[in-house]
Amino acid sequence: NFICHQNVVIGSDGFSFHTQNGENILDRLKKESSSSNKTFVRVGSIGAVEIGNNVEIGSNTCIDKGTIKSTIIKSGTKLDNLVHIAHNVEIGNNCLICGQVGIAGSTKVGNNVVMGGQVGIADNLYIGDNSILAGKTGVSANVPAKKFMMGNPAMEMKKNVASYMSLRRLPRIQ
């Protein structure tokens, strides 16, 4: 049993493409000068979406099905409005994910993780159990368990605050 609010999309194709000849996209972009010659071919998704018990999904949230295996939202997790969960993502038990969070493909989120609004997580990362990601945090590397991360790029809260304080002192340095 779960609660699904208005305009939620569950099971859409993930955002997966490859170049027509299977070459590296960066190499292909270097070769061609005209963007009209670039052909990207969609990779169809044949996976599913698995949703645990007592999950709540807010309005206008999109959850992509897995490319081959399932996208998984485990029991007790709550998703706010306007959240995007990409293909092959696994979200642990009892997570709280606030509005406008985007989690890119194949990322694994541990249990009891809290994400503030507008957090962005790059693909193929791991977010450890009991971690907190403050609002607008940009995550581009794995996050160990029990960490409080903030900023862009994400860093531990104490380091982020120290960095910000140093930045504010710069005008006084002569």
Regions picked out by a protein language model, each given a short descriptive name:
Residues 2-23, 27, 31-156:
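Structural signal for interior beta-strand "rungs" in well-ordered beta-sheet cores
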Residues 155-174:
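Long, leucine- and charge-enriched amphipathic alpha-helices
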